[in-house]
C-alpha cells in the first residue's frame, strides 16, 4: 500500500512538472490562435457608411452610387437601391470619393478640364462641398449645377478611360433541341448569340459608340427508313430545314439619340430556296424612345444586296441596290422578364419585286441566376424565291423554345 501511494505521488509530481514546463508554449499557441494565422494582418476596419438626412429628419446609411440630373441613387442593405430627388435631401455626407461634373462639362468630349473637383462630399444648403485629399481647399458647386456626381472608379473607367476591343461585351446565348425516335426520326437544334458593346457601359451616360453582333440558326431533319408494303418498295425519305442569320453593326453617336451606322447581314433559308443573301450598307439611326424600362430604335440604310439561290441559274440570282428600314423595341417586364421585337423591310430599287420582310420576337424569363427560359418566333417573307418543284412558299415561320445564358460585362 505504501509503495502504491509513493508511486502515485511520484506520477502526480512528474505530471505537475511537465504541465508547468508546457504552460508557456500552450499560452503562446493560444495567443497565436487568437491573433489568427501567422503573417495575417487583422481585419481592417470598415469604412464609415455614407449618410443621407432627409428633409423630414429621417436618416439612411449605406453607399452613395451616383447623382445624375438632380436624382441621387443610393444603396442601403435594408431597402436596396433607391432614387431620391435633391429637394427631398437635407444633407448628404459621403466617405466614397467622387468626381463632380457641372453642367459646363460634357462627359462625351474627349478632352476634359484638368481641375474637375474630386474627393469626399458634403451636401447642405443647396451646395455640394468637395473635400479633396491632402487638405487642399474645399471646392463648392451649387446643387443645381451638379449634373453628375460619380464615384472615382467609375469616373476613371467610363469618362477618362475606354474599354479595349475585347472588353465590355454583354449579351446572351440561347440553345434548344427537339429529338424524336419513332417510326420517323426527327431532330431539331436551334441556337442564338447576341452580343453588344456600348461605350460608355453605364446607361446613365450618353453613348458614344455601339457595336452589335448577332447570330441565330435552326437546323432540323425528319427521316424514315425504307420499307415494303403490299409487295411495293418505298425508298427512304428525309426532309431537311435550315435557317441561319448573322449580322454585325457599328454605330457612331453624334447626338445622344442620333447616330451614323454601318452594317452587314447574311441569311440562308433552305425552305425558301435561298442559299445566301448578303447585305453591306450604311445609314442613320434614331433612338426614338429611351427610358429605364423600354427603348425603341429606328434605322434606315442604303445598301448593296446579293441574293444567291439553291440550284439556280445566273439569271435568277440577284445583284440589288436597296435599303433596310428597321425598328427594334426592348421592354423590361415584371419579375425580370425582357421582351425584344424587331421588324425590318428590305426593298430593292433596281428590281421592285425583290423585296423581303422579317419580324422576330423573343421573351426571356429568368429562373436561376444567369439562366432564363426563352420563347421566340421568326417570321420571314421573301417575295422573289427561285422557281422550284414543288413551288417554294414565300413565307417561312419558326417557333423556338430554349434556355438562355446572360453574358454580363466584366468591365
Range-by-range predicted roles:
Residues 293-369:
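Outer-membrane beta-barrel transmembrane domain signature
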Residues 173-177, 191-197, 248-252, 266, ...:
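Residues on the lipid-exposed face of transmembrane beta-strands in outer-membrane beta-barrel proteins
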Residues 166-247, 251, 263-271:
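Transmembrane beta-barrel domains of bacterial outer-membrane proteins
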Residues 202-211, 257-260, 291-296, 330-339, ...:
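Repeated loop/turn-to-beta-strand initiation elements of outer-membrane beta-barrel proteins
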Residues 31-180, 185-186, 192-194:
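Compositionally biased alpha-helical segments
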Residues 185-191, 240-244, 276-280, 294, ...:
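Residues that define the transmembrane beta-barrel architecture of outer-membrane proteins
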Residues 395-411:
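Outer-membrane beta-barrel "beta-signal"
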Residues 171-173, 189, 209-215, 260-262, ...:
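Transmembrane beta-strands of outer-membrane beta-barrel proteins
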